[in-house]
Amino acid sequence: MNQNKPTSKLISDFWKGKTSEELFERAKKVSPGGVHSPVRSFRSVGGTPVFFASAKGATLTDISGKEYIDYCLSFGPLILGHRDPEVEEVVRETTEIAWSFGAAEPYSLELAELISSRVPWAEKVRFVNSGTEAVMSALRVARAATGREKILKFDGCYHGHLDSLLVKAGSGLAGESSSDSAGISATSIANTLVLPLDDEASVERVFETEGKNIAALIIEPLPANYGLLIQRKEFLLKIVETARKYGTLVVFDEVISGFRVGFQGMSGLLGIWPDLVTYGKIIGGGFPVGCYAGKKDLLDLVAPSGPVYQAGTLSANPFGMRAGLATLKKVQRDSIYSVLDDRTKIFTDTMTKLLNKKSNQEWEAVIHSSLFWFRKKTQQPIRRIDLIPEGHKESFAKVFHTFLKNGIYLAPSGYEVGFLSWAHDDEIIAKTLEIADKALKTF
């Protein structure tokens, strides 16, 4: 019996007898590109996106009833897997409590207290609805606190789709940036400086000329939105030291890495305390939640305590707060991180061997905790986007479709990382590797 099968006749009748191809054609008539976030369109890998109907544990089920072992996991929020039983029970309870208050309530307080008690640099916490909102708000706080306007970011780090950060580096040193999207005005990015990762010297030179104008340096301490570009600790320490020398606030974007690589995220693993930090994904337990946190004096600048305005109708909604709280409590109670790390290494080591055995190119897995990224093997670690091997996108697309056809779902882009969850137990991993071994015989 398929435990993922939807029970509502009203829901299942909508797609009964339909194919993903049919639904995608209909979707393109009513939504841009047929999707509600670009990567879901399969544009990067080609083909038609699979329309999924349900999910449970480590498994996705499409509208035809076919099952897939999921290593995308909604791009990171589901560290316990789909519909973890404990979280699901809390969600069911919440339907009988409230769907939204738009008022003060105790659930956000409990989650904020848990985060603040375990994350010392998160002295105060403000919940929002997404990682993009969290970053936007954190940078607003940084500008207010410093009285400065410029923001320094790094090529290869993604911080959401706010205008000022959809910027790529130009050919010059931080001064010739261009937007990553149509519809963004030149004035929106005029105060954004962009530098390559893994280059301390460039950071120092920019601060020598612009230091007094830079409100915040923002970085993913574990860049995981353009492949997995693991940075040297020495680089991170140096840029933080340089920023603080000039009175610039340090913002760590831990929307992906927060509560994924450890309860204190990369900041805790590195022993580097940011001034402000952004979280998302895991803290909502699968619901749309983000937050920004930091030192008390900085967060007290936010309305109604201070002059920095930020608000949201559904901020701290009870579903996200209670699901996030249940997730973090279970993560904390069951000490899942070391187990997930071990499982990820076992999975990626064996999968890499299978790929290398069947493929005409040599693959390797870049891993950190329970994140992984398969790519062409290189002589040196890849820490910058300009060093990603040519042809990677095409090579990954072939692997993606080989696996998809046989019931393994990876993120549909060669530049997206994969994830394991608590639901990916030894049996699921063994089954995945068995499927991959058979699938790659026709690779």
Curated annotation (Swiss-Prot):
Keywords: Cytoplasm, Isomerase, Porphyrin biosynthesis, Pyridoxal phosphate. The lineage of its organism: Bacteria, Pseudomonadati, Spirochaetota, Spirochaetia, Leptospirales. Its main location: cytoplasm. Its EC number is 5.4.3.8. GO terms for cellular component: cytoplasm. The modification N6-(pyridoxal phosphate)lysine is found at K281. Belongs to the class-III pyridoxal-phosphate-dependent aminotransferase family. HemL subfamily. Its cofactor is pyridoxal 5'-phosphate. It comes from the Bacteria. The gene is hemL. Pathway: Porphyrin-containing compound metabolism; protoporphyrin-IX biosynthesis; 5-aminolevulinate from L-glutamyl-tRNA(Glu): step 2/2. It is found in: Cytoplasm. This is Glutamate-1-semialdehyde 2,1-aminomutase. It catalyses: (S)-4-amino-5-oxopentanoate = 5-aminolevulinate. CDD domains: OAT_like.
